[in-house]
UniProtKB/Swiss-Prot annotation:
PANTHER family: GLYCOSYLTRANSFERASE, UDP-N-ACETYLGLUCOSAMINE--N-ACETYLMURAMYL-(PENTAPEPTIDE) PYROPHOSPHORYL-UNDECAPRENOL N-ACETYLGLUCOSAMINE TRANSFERASE 1. This is UDP-N-acetylglucosamine--N-acetylmuramyl-(pentapeptide) pyrophosphoryl-undecaprenol N-acetylglucosamine transferase. HAMAP family: MurG. Pathway: Cell wall biogenesis; peptidoglycan biosynthesis. Its main location: membrane. It comes from Alteromonas mediterranea (strain DSM 17117 / CIP 110805 / LMG 28347 / Deep ecotype). It is found in: Cell inner membrane. Keywords: Cell cycle, Cell division, Cell inner membrane, Cell membrane, Cell shape, Cell wall biogenesis/degradation, Glycosyltransferase, Membrane, Peptidoglycan synthesis, Transferase.
Length: 364
């Protein structure tokens, strides 16, 4: 009889896509996969496209909200715990693996109360509150970045750095060749602001880079933002033949393949994909991210000289200068991308799968 794994992940691609990578790898080995999430978040649309049964619980976030919202969230949390317990009792999975998101907390607690082993995967260099709590009852705590290890000191014996699972097509992105940079007079810049777009990138990139000679730009600006971004480029006299705008990029692997370097936020999945693609990057961490986790994610590459980081507060002053430097010395861009590739966790997905099988085999 096939082993069964319940994946818990939701809210953002940073949680969902690593979960999908592991789900698909386990399914390829004959496992039966189910998913626990929330009906209002992106997992409700994305997961069914992969033919994975998804089960919903009525949970909401609590952190950083007003007293009324917190009370409502607490009530929903209690309901979601009982809902998760009913679902898990019915499914009887051999193991539950949480990748973060609202469903992971109640799902992990419910699984443990039923004697089902729990694995937690933390993508960020600064661990989230839910995973910190779940680590106390988890059989294993798996980390995307080694810098997060000190935050799980209470579960030190069960903490393992495995990297962040990345989709196979990202790993297939071909490295840039040194000879293509000999005497290069142009570079391709990919600007990625996430599914909603990043307002600071939409405003600053056109102003600071729109008229740089030798720069071709693909700019993902988020749904509903393209008209304003076009005007921003046109207002500085940019040649729109060298600028391509999109609300959303469906094929990120092709976008990375085209790019010489990327300007982007520093979510855990983005940082991991940049490294896997072997591209140089200028990270602009979201300054209001919980526990400043995006800065810590970016630093995992920056401290290896494998990426640049510019604080949002000084982006306007420094972005154009950084891009001009690469246009003048494109070989530096190539070298940084190659260094980024050496920081990538190429075996992350199989590492997680190995831990899943190990825990089930041990009967923890």
């Amino acid at each position: 009889m096939a082993k069964r794994c319940l994946i818990m992940a939701g809210g953002t691609g940073g949680h969902v896509f690593p979960g999908l990578a592991v789900a698909n790898a386990l399914r390829a080995e004959g496992w039966d996969i189910h998913w626990l999430g929330t009906a209002e978040r992106m997992e409700a649309q994305v997961v069914p496209k992969h033919d994975i049964p998804i089960h919903f619980i009525p949970v909401k976030g609590l952190r950083g909200k007003g007293i009324s919202a917190r009370i409502q969230g607490a009530v929903a949390l209690v309901k979601s715990l009982f809902s998760a317990r009913r679902i898990i009792k019915r499914l009887q999975p051999d193991i539950v693996v949480g990748f973060g998101g609202y469903a992971s907390g109640p799902g992990g607690v419910a699984a443990k109360s039923l004697g089902i082993p729990v694995i937690v995967h933390e993508q960020n260099a600064a661990a989230g509150m839910t995973n910190k709590l779940l680590s106390k009852l988890a059989s294993r705590v798996l980390l995307g970045f080694d810098d997060a290890k000190e935050q799980f000191s209470g579960a030190a014996d069960n903490v393992h750095t495995v990297g962040n699972p990345v989709r196979d097509d990202i790993w297939q992105v071909k490295p840039k060749k040194r000879e293509s940079y000999a005497g290069a007079t142009s570079l391709n810049m990919l600007v990625v602001g996430g599914s909603l777009g990043a307002q600071i990138l939409n405003e600053t990139v056109p102003e600071t880079c729109g008229v740089l000679n030798g720069l071709s730009i693909k700019h993902q600006c988020g749904k509903g933002n393209s008209d304003g971004v076009v005007k921003a480029y046109e207002s500085v006299g940019a040649d729109m033949a060298n600028v391509e705008l999109s609300d959303f990029i469906d094929n990120m692997a092709a976008a990375y393949e085209w790019a010489d370097f990327i300007v982007c936020r520093a979510g855990a999945l983005t940082v991991s994909e940049v490294a896997a693609s072997g591209r140089a990057a200028i990270f602009v961490p979201l300054p209001f991210a919980v526990d400043d986790h995006q800065t810590k994610n970016a630093q995992s590459l920056v401290k290896q000289n494998a990426a640049l980081m510019i604080a949002q507060s000084v982006l306007k002053q420094n972005l154009g200068q950084a891009v001009r430097r690469w246009l003048e010395h494109p070989e530096d861009c190539l070298k940084m991308g190659a260094l980024a590739k050496t920081c990538a966790s190429i075996h992350a997905t199989e590492n997680v799968v190995s831990h899943v099988k190990s825990v089930v085999g041990e009967g923890d």
